[in-house]
């Protein structure tokens, strides 16, 4: 039987069983559309999960002079100096990665005051740069974060944790552009952080100020060490980004070949 005869026979069979053929074609079409829909939904879900983890700071890692997760017996390594941290930030060039420098200038003992309201003396004061909020997975609920100009000029501006804002402002108040004091030092509020809850190491009872401002206003504060944080857009870039960061940090710390790392790197 020739090809032409086969095609003719198939067409006659389709015409003879038109209803059955239409049902079969419809079922196949519906099945294909359902499969495409499922695959599209999976891609969207994966993108949403990656985005949510990025919002939580999961696409980042930190370089410190101690291990955050330890039994307390670990001896801290030499402090990471401001010069070392800024040198790292300047030299780190991994793809689309971005770097933040921060340090706790007052640990759990600052008082924040506005008019006749004030917090308990249990507030952390962090000096941070323009990338800290993004890399740390914070969200600004009101106002904004720091600009590069405010970092350069050591501006007296502050972003308040949600618990701090609630303590010194009422729900009817608009805290933005209001003046407050931190341990009797004046600052202007430019932003409020969205609440993270008690599981995030008291991040709601802290205030953020520009790193340059912190070094100027609280120069005698007991800074243990600076923290370098690195964020990447793609989770698949984490391991190579950590590898590059390790190599650069060894150069910054002037470690010789064979010497152990005198810093720790931990994923967020």
Predicted regions and their residues:
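Membrane-helix entry/capping segments
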Residues: 1-4, 250-268
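A short amphipathic helical element positioned immediately N-terminal to and/or at the very start
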Residues: 3-15, 84, 88
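A generic "structured core" feature
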Residues: 8-22, 96, 125
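Short, strongly hydrophobic transmembrane alpha-helices
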Residues: 19-44
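Short aromatic/hydrophobic contact patches that present stacked aromatics
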Residues: 29, 227-229, 264
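Hydrophobic, regular-secondary-structure patches
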Residues: 42-124, 131-134, 167, 215-216, ...
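Mid-to-C-terminal secondary-structure elements
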Residues: 126, 131-146, 154-256
């Amino acid at each position: 039987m020739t090809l032409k005869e086969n095609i003719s026979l198939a067409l006659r069979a389709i015409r003879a069983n038109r209803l059955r053929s239409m049902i079969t074609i419809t079922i196949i079409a519906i099945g294909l559309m359902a499969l495409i829909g499922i695959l599209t939904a999976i891609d969207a879900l994966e993108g949403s999960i990656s985005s949510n983890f990025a919002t939580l700071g999961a696409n980042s890692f930190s370089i410190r002079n101690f291990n955050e997760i330890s039994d307390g017996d670990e001896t801290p390594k030499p402090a990471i100096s401001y010069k070392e941290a800024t040198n790292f930030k300047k030299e780190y060039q991994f793809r689309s990665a971005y770097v933040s420098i921060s340090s706790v200038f007052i640990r759990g003992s600052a008082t924040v005051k506005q008019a006749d309201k004030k917090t308990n003396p249990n507030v952390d004061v962090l000096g941070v740069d323009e990338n800290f909020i993004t890399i740390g997975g914070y969200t600004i609920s009101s106002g904004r974060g720091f600009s590069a100009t405010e970092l350069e000029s050591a501006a007296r501006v502050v972003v308040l944790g949600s618990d701090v804002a609630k303590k010194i402002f009422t729900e009817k108040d608009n805290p933005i552009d209001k003046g407050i004091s931190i341990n009797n030092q004046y600052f202007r509020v430019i932003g409020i952080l969205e609440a993270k809850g008690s599981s995030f190491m008291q991040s709601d009872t802290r205030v953020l100020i520009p790193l340059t401002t912190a070094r100027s206003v609280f120069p005698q504060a007991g800074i243990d060490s600076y923290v370098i944080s690195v964020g990447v857009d793609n989770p698949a870039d984490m391991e190579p980004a950590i590898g590059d960061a390790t190599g650069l940090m060894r150069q910054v710390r002037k470690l010789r070949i064979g010497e152990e790392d005198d810093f720790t790197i931990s994923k967020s």
